[in-house]
Amino acid sequence: MARSAPAFSSFTAGEISPRLEGRTNIEKYREGLSDLTNMVVMPHGGVTRRPGTEYLGEIADSSVKSRLIPFQFKTSDTYILEFGNQTMRVLRNDLQVLNSTTRTITGATKANPVVITTSGAHGYSNGDEVYIDSAGGMTEINGRNYLVAGVTSTTFQLTDLFGSNVDGTNFTTYTSGGTVNEIYEISTVYTEAQLFDLRFAQSADTMYIVHPSHPVKTLTRTDHNAWTFANLTINENGPPTLTSSNNYPSVVSFFEQRLVFGATNNNPQTLWFSKNGDYGNFHTGTNDDDALIYTIASNQVNAIRFLSATRVLTVGTSGGEYVLTSTNDGPVTPTTTLIRKYSNYGTAQIEPVQVADVTLFVQRGKRKIREFKFVGDVNTGGYSAPDMTILAEHVTEGGIVQMAFQQEPDSVVWCVRDDGTLLGLTYRREEEVVAWHKHVIGGTFSSGQAVVESIATLPTDTGEDELFMIVKRTINSVTKRYIEKMKVFDFGDDATTAFFVDSGLSYSGSATTTLSGLYHLEGETLQVLGNGATHPDETVSSGGITLDYSSTKAAVGFGYDSTMQTLRIESGSVDGTSQGKPKR
């Protein structure tokens, strides 16, 4: 039997469909894999294990879904907005933002439950979530979130986020000081069922938010813990109008210094462009900078599903994809607006992502991601929308419900599948890299896998964009939804800093066998990485674990398996293909 030593040097096709098993004639076959789970394809062709996720905090109400929305003033001043059922919270620098009013602690009892006394009236109500820090003596209560109970004007009892009393009978004695503050939270009009239909566009410190059941809202930031919702004042001379029931827009974007709305219930194919630079002015006219209204003419009523602004305005509808430009290659004006249809795939009601000058959108059936891009030369070219899942149709089974783009370090489009599986698409078209990989987040929900419900990304100045997610699990027999951030592990990083656990926390300090602060994983059996090496699993009790041997650096959280399997090798044979022939 002839010897063969095939080299697998690149995996830029990622995981490919079982339907292509043995299809060695396909160009991407040698770069494909039959399974790639919890591994990320790098643009250079190699693969690396997915880093774990760091626990940042619990959402406002774990009994209902929430959605994460990014807010970026500049790359060094960014926030994650947690929209819940008629609530909004804020994360900055991986921490939940607190109210501006801080109360001073004057007492903490060694009792069950611990009773906190403040220097004056605290103003809290039963069930409010607070954060305690810097208490002297009774350091066990520091750096944690609590729900308050048994409220009087200057005292309250501590319960944990599972609703159980915090037993302080074995804590060290309180001596002095400490602060308590409430988690910053404001009310919104948006219910749980409406959250994933919200669309938004941001200019500086103001975000414009639309939903077909509500008037257009502005969300304005004046400080880390000072955010204000208001109705946008719209000056218009319609019809069609934007300011009454069934006439509220469902999509929004900025384009050529205009605020653009689209798709009301009464006018699903209509676009409204504000006056240039005056975002509340929709008073139409014939001057070049006047507002304008444009209705797409078609044989069918296909509602507008998304707007994507690059050099042109891409308009995705339920029946096809359009490009809006000017008739004279100048700015769009009331007299020069031109819209052309380029494809008939139809789009799902899911926000697309922009990668360079390309718009990636989810097709109407939610199984395909298409790449809407310009092809050809300037004079005779047009737009096409090839299928990015053609070699891996199986990875999107069940449908995609959300997307987010992480530009650095590896140019990955992240997707949430309907069953809560996280999908990744390493996408670098200029290098012909289109590689799918799937990710099962550690932990369980009910009797199945942990469920990813929302994702968002933020840019940074450090060269590593950040991916945030909400993960639903069953923790200590209770449904919990946690906000987590995927960590980063680069080539050359010290193995002792490896973070390959989910919903985890890390420790760095003097050698210890006792790790605390794991209250969010109470009762769960966790994986431990100590000084870069695996450690026997430990179960959390009273928020802590005891290690079998001391560590100066540790990461603790849910473990997960990373798997990679090649396709059947095509190494050739003396009489043709090696497929179907005995091997040893």
Which residues does each predicted region cover?
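Small/polar beta-strand repeat architecture
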Residues: 2-23, 27, 95-202, 210-215, ...
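Surface-exposed acidic, glycine/proline-enriched linker/cap segments
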Residues: 182, 238-242, 281-299, 380-397
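Short, surface-exposed terminal/edge motifs of secreted or surface/virion proteins that either
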Residues: 80-93, 154-164, 211-233, 266-273, ...
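Surface-exposed loop/turn positions within WD40 beta-propeller blades
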Residues: 85, 204, 213, 224, ...
